Amino acid sequence: MPTHQNPTPNQKVFIITGASDGIGAEMARQLASRYGADDGGIGLVLAARSQANLQAVADTCTGLGATCLVVTTDVSVQSQCQELIDQTIKHWGRIDGLINNAGVSAQALFSEVKASDLHWYEQLMRVNLWGSVWCTHAALPHLKAARGSIVAVSSLAGLIGVPGRTAYSATKFAMTGFFEALRSELRIAGVSVTTAFPGVVLTDIRTHGLNAQGLTAGSSGLKEDDAMDVEECAALILRGMYLREREVVMTRKGKLGRFIKLLFPAVVERMAMNALKDDVKPQ
């Protein structure tokens, strides 16, 4: 059990879920690079299921001047979300930012999912929505005390329903709505809530998503010609957090699609269908 460590007056403490790879790991590296050498430095709490991968990220961030705490966490389990926050407070006594990044993708036509396999829809909701809800609820008193920041990494699939992503879109729409409502609740408390909407990003989540059977799909099913580098994606999310922005919509197509949806929803539905590879489109 880590011992309590008082942060220096200028040190900020950030929690990142899903920090073992992809966007979460890159945000950790960029935060360490930006603040690690500053007076007071930065404390990073890195959470995910893989202890080994988390430690590798922590080693890199430590080399950049950050102080790191690794907490192995499955965000689909409420008690582990609470333990993540408890360990952070025991170690540092404060939380300045919570980045809800942990998530699982999925690519499956709803008609191809058997009734006996629908349980993975519920599990996806536990990871993508409830993990963020539980972590945020546990951290909220400390974030209020620090007048800190909450980041929710949603998806363009949380703004526009994407064919083949009924489960994933459901979780991300729910996440979008939850944090939109929470933002209004926390305005007077001085806690910012930034929701990020990445499109296709070059990370392993593309191939680690679930198929109709709830098994690893091995492919995103999406065209990836315009996929964003993970470094750019992480930088845009962190910029939104620094500026305490309400939302960060990543791509030009995403911004355009969101606007067009209000006036011509059928056009956006065709755009979403055209984003799929031909072999995964409904016949």
Features from the language model and the residues they span:
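Active-site helix of classical SDR
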Residues: 136, 171
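Residue(s) in the substrate-gating loop at a strand-loop-helix junction
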Residues: 155
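SDR active-site lid
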Residues: 188-252
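Conserved glycine-rich cofactor-binding loop
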Residues: 20-21
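Conserved glycine-rich Rossmann-like NAD(P)H-binding loop of the short-chain dehydrogenase/reductase
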Residues: 34-57
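Conserved mid-core segment of classical short-chain dehydrogenase/reductases
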Residues: 105-122, 164-167
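The beta1-alpha1 cofactor-binding region of Rossmann-like NAD(H)/NADP(H)-dependent oxidoreductases
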Residues: 52, 72-83
